[in-house]
Amino acid sequence: MLSKVFSLQDILEHIHDGQTIMFGDWHGQFAADEIIDGMLEKGVKDIKAIAVSAGYPGQGVGKLIVAHRVSSIVTTHIGLNPEALKQMLAGELAVEFVPQGTWAERVRCGGAGLGGVLTPTGVGTSVEEGKQKLVIDGKEYLLELPLHADVALVKATKADTAGNLYFRMN
């Protein structure tokens, strides 16, 4: 079997300008910082990020936002990163806000190859703008489309040659 363990340099060869990158951290905690630092050093830009939040300015995707390397982000909030708010208000960072449970379901749908998820969350609010609404048994739902990425970054404590990842404390 071909090993699924790669060097940092090998990984960075697969990361390019303009890609959609999913960040598997929690507000910058448990971020794949070595890879993110390598992306900064390589000069990767125009990243379309999918992340639970914009993180803190010095952690995770937050580092890339501060360096103006992220052009858009699909996220649940940006409140921990003042630079993200500044860039959003200046029109430098496109932000799609998604309720956290809906965000998680959209990520899951993308990974499972599903066409989307129906949710009542956001019906009757600005969240429904531009989305398909369905009525099932008299109840309104929004169709939320899956999130897909070219690359997903996760930090694991250990990995084996088959690609299995092991995480600290779980």
What are these regions (language model features)?
Residues 1-170:
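Conserved alpha/beta enzyme-core scaffold
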